[in-house]
Amino acid sequence: MVKKTFIAAIMMALAATTSTAFAEGQPTPVKVVSKAQGMALNGISASMKDETGTPQLGEGVTMREKKMDVETTPEQNFSRSKRFIYRFYKPENASNELIVLLHGSGGNEASLVPLASKIWPRATLLGIRGRVMQDGGTRWYKRITPVKFDQKDVKLEANAFVTSLTRLAEEKELDLSHATFVGYSNGANLLAATMMLHPDLVKRAVLMRSMPVLDNVSVANLGKARVLTITGQEDKLYSPFAPALSALLRSGGAKVDARTIEADHMLGEKDAAAISQWVA
């Protein structure tokens, strides 16, 4: 257990020092390395880490958070960075596909890379880190309880995410209209909220272990959106909310493929199989 914790800590530190912030720096393209070298990346099950070759983080651009870049509040264990940290992962002979990755609670911009590189081996991956830190873990917005969230903060972070991503797309000449957005848990929730608040941004999305987080929101025009939701049938806390999210997206006209797999809240091979089938 100590060894695993030590490895995870080193990888988290490596990701933090090799990433940059929206509108700053040029992330360095990276190469795919051996399976063994990719095993320490967090965010998915051990079985998938064993079988997936993953991009090496490489040298990249060092961007350390300064005190002036973090807003703190009187609340205990809460802070917010002023920028979103991001990193590109581009394999050799990359296709024109762009996959935007939003991690779950406690993750970072590298967390979903093993999963995504397995499904889209030639795509350019854009991993983004949520800028909220609460109770020692990274998040996309402030939570009140595990299933109740600060409504003002959800909207604040969704709007900030869209503004920053749009600016980055303009600078890097990225075509977001053909991008696939992949979110897990907290990241999937932020992505779903973003779709409701900014319906023109996301045209294709994968939402894993997600739930609706906005209490009152107008029905958005999602007629051009395709969405895959993946729920773990053993995910006792969050699976009961999945039908409500699918219904909300469908009410806006989105084409939703709602799937339930034999899994808990953690990700694994069945998620990769479901997504691969959906994108085929």
Annotate the PLM regions.
Residues 25-98:
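A domain-start/cap signature at the N-terminus of enzymes
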Residues 201-212:
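A conserved short beta-strand
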